Amino acid sequence: MKKILTMALMTIPMLFSSNILAEGFNDNYLQVGYSTSNYKFVDEIMDIEGSVEIGNNFSILGRYARETGDWRDPLEYETSTYTGTTIGIGKTFELDTNTSVTSSLSYLDYDLKQTQKYDSSSTTNHTSSKTNTYIASVGVRNLSDSGIQTNLKLNIWRAGKLKSKSNEIELELMKHFSDTLAIGIRVLRHDAKPASSYNSDWTETGIYVRRSF
């Protein structure tokens, strides 16, 4: 968490230090991000995501994420590594030259590898599992004349044969330094319904760098 706060404090002054004007939204990009989470099973998240426009305000979306965590339960120590690949299609609806509504439908393939070691044993147990999730998203974005972009998005998760339900609210603030380079900060709140030991509420905070083309 301290690492994220330091990076955010370094980034915020840059968000307002330039008057570079961005000419509309560009949905052709590749970005790399780092986030932290207060979810019990995930501490750090590294991800790469991208978008390619295919015409008529449609885009192909992709993301690869690796999440890691470790924790102690009574008499045992555990670690987890999640890897997820997301593919989807997005559609934007322009309200004016600086504001648009965003929407997408994505499929997430999710792998979990977990280790468990009891304090009374020298043996480490290894387990793995797979699951898949469908994610529908809708949001709004605005780009100011100074190149500051604000994104607000609602993500609706339907996992495990569409029965498990979770919702997310995500807010991003991004500064475009040129037509090809931007840096952003983000905060996400995950609301699990119904909540369980492996599907609880959590918050993520992060930073990312975007390269447009």
Model-found features: residue ranges?
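Detector for outer-membrane/organellar transmembrane beta-barrel domains
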Residues: N98-A159
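Outer-membrane beta-barrel architecture
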Residues: E49-S51, G88-K91, S137-R141, E170-E172, ...
